[in-house]
Amino acid sequence: MGETARLLGMLNLAGADTAINCWNDKYYWDFWRPWNAIQPTDPSWTPLFTAPYPEHPSGHLCLDSAHLGVLQMFFGNNVSFGVTSSRFGGETRFFNRFSDPLEEIVEARICAGLHFRTGDEQSVTLGGNVVRYMAEHYFQPVGNH
């Protein structure tokens, strides 16, 4: 039970610290979305989704990177798992490592018209940096009490 509590604490702290950093950066950079760049040259193009806040960095990828980084740190990277979508007919995607989904998420966010590649890749870095900092500074053993 103690290890489960530790894992949940790590996931939540990583998520909170990553979200704070991500949203700080979004409004620091205030970068435009792909549809702002594409539609003036191709008015028939439309994104799958729109968002009312800046593009860079990707909140989705910042958090995905942080959460997957915590799972990787806790269990090791080579863990097979599946993710089932309740939104798209219950389709399940299978992965062999915790690091594997990030590439697909980067591509999906670009194809949806939500992000540029640079924003997505830097989001993965941001989430990873938060997890590395957390691993070095938080949740250190305190001995037996």
Q: Could you say what each language-model-derived stretch is?
A:
Residues 1-145:
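Hydrophobic alpha-helical bundle signature of multipass membrane enzymes
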